[in-house]
Amino acid sequence: AIWNGLGLAAWLVDADTLDTGAELSDAEKARRERTRQSGLSGIIQYQWSPDGKALLFPLGGKLFLYTLDAPANEAVRELPVSGEFIDARISPQGRYVAYVQGQNLHVIDLRSGKSRALTEDGGGVIHNGEAEFVAQEEMDRERGYWWAPDDSYIAFERYDETHVPVIKRMEVYPDRTEVIEQRYPAAGKNNVAIKLGLVSPADGNMRWIDLGEETDVYLARVDWLPDSKHLSYQLEQRNQQQLDLKRVDVASLEQQTLLTERSNTWINLSSDLRFLDDGSFIWASERSGYLHLYRYDRDGTLTHPISKGNWNIDKLLGVDATNGRVYVQSNHDYVPDTQVYALALDGSSASAPQRISKEDGTHTATFAEDASFYLDTFSHPETPPQVSLRKADGSLIQWIERN
């Protein structure tokens, strides 16, 4: 079903009419366990197209595209994917759908309706377009490929498990127990060998980014810059005491180290990196003993802290570069609470964030891409979860679920 903005819901697809009841692959089972979706069935995930006119969703081992303004008998389109697949996603411009099948990266051209493999060496110990076990389990990185904003390239991870030891683990079911062999990089043992590639969805042209001579490292994060001409990646040493942020020129593959984060203990990874249109960026760091945000210019020179003091940022929620505002989640005012705050991008309010959320309790916010409004889920020991749509200043636009 879909909420139409007027407080009403419209039924789109009946999962029972499409679901074949196909058995999930081991990879998909593992993904659902990590996202706490293992006990669910039917349509459990979906993605909007960039123009908001279509929905992509997997169901019963098949992949479907639902077009909202199409006639009822033409609205649901089954895409040409045969067999088990994972991680299907629409490209930012809506031209393609990428997915991983047989440990290879594939792409569907939605104009022609044709599907083809972008990599062909996957299988066995070789994986393309997937995040390795450690990345998924310990680094909060489930993705193994990343679309350029203009659809020109896909950056993807290729990893080789050849030298990773094999262990045995048990899977216990109500009627049986199964022994599963799995490659597991225990402490002191070999890790996977990682490569970072760039491939064109249009012609399959592929190139590789030089990750350096040190091979016992983690590919922690990959992010495209808004111009689609540059890619960034974060490389962490295995002892987790050094993290490098690098920027790659896509045309020449020349690289620049923008910053290096070091710690005598370990570095907590963050997903709060944001590149702005001018090439400058926002970086999250615990260097002060608290997690705060810092503004860097395009060459990696620190210009100023965006937040500071004896309090933590929990999460970067959104950036409104036009109006110079940054929105974060924090417990700045009262430790048991989770609230939404606004900070000035120029650092002028670094020590005094402005609270946006109204009620005391727990607020979980999802901001629009331009940070002009957000979806707020609020709860309190005496109040069940309430969902509302709000302007960036916290004022109410519409209740979704007043509860």
Enumerate the language-model features and the residues they cover.
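Beta-propeller folds
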Residues: 1-385, 389-390
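N-terminal cap/lid segment of alpha/beta-hydrolase-fold proteins
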Residues: 399-403
